[in-house]
Amino acid sequence: ARAALIRLPDKRAEFVAAHAALRAILASYQDIPPESLLFTTTCAWCGDPQHGKPRLQDSGGLRFNLTRAGTLALVAVTRNAEVGVDAEPLDRAVDWRAIARRALSSDERAQVEAAEPGLRDSLAGRLWCRKEAVAKATGLGLALNLKTWTARPDSNSRWLAASLDEMPEPVFVSDLDTVTDAFAAVAVTGAGEDPTVTVRDAVSG
């Protein structure tokens, strides 16, 4: 139904392909046909079942998140931990000042301003991608205030840790450097202090 609302054929095809891949991946974890998967939504902010982060109806602890950026689609899957993933194409125009106004903490803005002028847009784009991944992991999305927290290096791992007023425990976020034509990041909460990420495939085209 959602695909039918997309007017451009190329964009509609990308949407359909990404969601077909999502179904195939999730079905492989549960050893069932993709068409038998049932999804549900509940908003983490207001509890409304008409919108919110998608979940499997019979998940067995499986959690997932999908992001699309142009022809690139990324799927993140975890067990018994919330997950969010985001990607932003490298060729997308970025204005670091606009990102700073919308999403960066004072520490992050200072970090961007201290960078070489030619690197500021790129750095802000990467910080934005991390923020989006965290927002998706929490399930709060745009209801999460992105400017009140900073993802900082965690001494025990390669992850960055973000302490949010809205969450009882830190959210961990890491860049996905294997994705070469986009900024990409994955975030998890409820997975302990040093989650392991295995990248099985990252294909654009």
Which stretches of residues belong to each language-model region?
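Core catalytic alpha/beta fold that binds nucleotide/phospho-ligands
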Residues: 1-205
